[in-house]
From Swiss-Prot:
Exhibits S-adenosyl-L-methionine-dependent methyltransferase activity. One of its GO terms (molecular function) is methyltransferase activity. Its EC number is 2.1.1.-. Belongs to the UPF0677 family. This is Putative S-adenosyl-L-methionine-dependent methyltransferase Mjls_1073. InterPro entries: Ppm1/Ppm2/Tcmp, SAM-dependent_MTases_sf, SAM_mthyl_Trfase_ML2640-like. GO terms for biological process: methylation. It comes from Mycobacterium sp. (strain JLS). Keywords: Methyltransferase, S-adenosyl-L-methionine, Transferase. S-adenosyl-L-methionine binds at residues 133, 162-163.
């Protein structure tokens, strides 16, 4: 089903299902030899969502080889996807670690999905971690982790609000202090936002961030219309590939393509000092194999860090 202005979802449908897909990939990556991440909550959270396809992936009952027996290495190859999510996860984990080392004690996770950093990272004493996502997603994850006996490793405050609504008011009501430096992440979010919503969100973060604040973003690079069509074709090919295993979701209906601001440049114009790394370079930095050609990727992304 195509996106609408006020659409909602749970973790088994629409955009929410992509959060479960990413958590399943983190579970696969956690089991890998010489794993670059350790997310012990990924598998149980995926199992709790109850999408059979993702549960089988997360538990190892369905292997990457099962999904791609001919080893085509395309966008539906779970080994490559899990490696990509492992590198991405490590990037944002390291970002929070660096921010903590710099003395930042406020962290904000935008559209947190099944992110478990509030429970698995070694936060310094006095750190407050805010998680923002749709109310149903927040409630499900909090209840599931409580049943598992998981305890946050920081002062954990959930903010159940859609980013299209008054999330700033909800964040401040939860205790966020805009006069103190903060560390923000937007992981796997911008592709699901229209270009103008991306700009608005970056402006809002800038407004809430005094000097010393930090931001890490997975930015989607603008592409010509012809490239957009290729991206949609790859997404539809993955849908066809995975449908035989009982999972049917057209990813191409969930994303917004077309021209959008380049994140590093946009932030630089608003007083941030930025640095960026390509997905390929990030994989290599983590000791993981990068895709041999762009057909293995849904889109071209840059991982951006910024300091104010």
């Amino acid at each position: 089903m195509a996106r609408t202005d006020n659409d909602t979802w749970d973790l088994a449908s629409s955009v929410g299902a992509t959060a479960t897909m990413v958590a399943a990939a983190r579970a696969v990556a956690t089991r890998a030899p010489d794993a670059v991440i350790d997310d012990p909550f990924a598998e149980p959270l995926v199992r709790a969502v109850g999408v059979d396809f993702f549960t089988r992936l997360a538990t190892g009952d369905l292997t990457p080889t099962d999904l791609d027996p001919d080893a085509t290495g395309g966008a539906g190859n779970m080994d490559r996807f899990a490696d990509g999510m492992a590198a991405r996860t490590r990037f944002f984990d390291d970002f929070f670690s660096d921010a903590a080392d710099a003395g930042v004690r406020q962290a904000v996770i935008l559209a947190s999905g099944l992110d478990s950093r509030a429970y698995r990272l070694p936060w310094p004493a006095g750190t407050v971690v805010f998680e923002i996502d749709q109310p149903g997603v927040i409630t499900f994850k909090s209840d599931t982790l409580a049943r598992l006996g998981a305890k946050p490793t920081a002062d954990h405050r959930t903010v159940p609000v859609d980013l299209r609504d008054d999330w700033i008011g909800a964040l401040e009501a939860a205790g966020f202090d805009r006069t103190e430096p903060s560390a923000w992440i937007a992981e796997g979010l911008f592709g699901y936002l229209p270009p103008e919503a991306q700009d608005r969100l970056l402006d809002q973060i800038t407004e809430l961030s005094p000097p010393g604040s930090r931001l890490a973003v997975e930015g989607v690079v603008s592409s010509p219309d012809a490239d957009d069509e290729q991206i949609r074709e790859r997404m539809q090919a993955v849908r066809d590939q995975w449908r035989q295993f009982g999972f049917d979701l057209d990813f191409s209906e969930l994303v917004y393509t077309g021209e959008r601001a380049e994140v590093a440049a946009y932030l630089g114009e608003r007083g941030w000092r930025t640095d960026s790394i390509t997905a390929t370079a990030l994989l290599e930095k983590c000791g993981l194999q990068s895709a041999e050609d762009s057909s293995a990727n849904f889109a071209d992304v840059r991982y951006v860090t910024a300091v104010k």
